Regions:
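Long, low-complexity or tandemly repetitive, helically biased scaffold regions used
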Residues: 2-133
Length: 133
């Protein structure tokens, strides 16, 4: 038995590739933030540094957003765009208002709040998989 991965309709191949190109900076954004969390051996990086990296990576994602916009994934695109805006706005508030989370739980909560809006990208990835048929 041969299992073949179905292909996307031709008109969605370029948008899907463009979407896939955004995943590395999106993953780096999340990894930057989680580097602030202290471990058993390391103290964790300063939030100001990791927040700056997070914002830089999300701006890279923002720059590539239009490349994957398509009527077939418009709802997902809009949700991702809103999620980016929300995450960047919260990061800006944290940076400019000098928000300092209290303790480990406060840091984890803040990181969760910053990452949650980006869950829309998971739903967009699922939609592209669904469109493969």
């Amino acid at each position: 038995m041969s299992l073949r991965r179905r292909r996307l309709p031709e008109h969605l191949e370029a948008p899907a590739r463009a979407f896939d190109d955004l995943l590395p900076p999106l993953e780096r954004a999340g990894a930057a933030l989680t580097a602030s969390v202290p471990g058993t051996r390391l103290p964790g990086r300063p939030l100001a540094e990791t927040l700056s990296e997070f914002e830089d990576e999300l701006r890279e994602v923002r720059d590539g957003m239009d490349d994957w916009r398509s009527p077939d994934v418009e709802l997902e695109w809009e949700a991702c765009s809103r999620g980016l805006d929300e995450a960047l706005a919260l990061a800006d508030r944290v940076r400019t208002e000098g928000v300092h989370p209290e303790g480990f739980e406060g840091l984890i909560g803040l990181i969760g709040d910053l990452l949650a809006p980006l869950d829309a990208f998971e739903r967009a990835a699922a939609r592209f998989r669904e469109l493969r048929g």
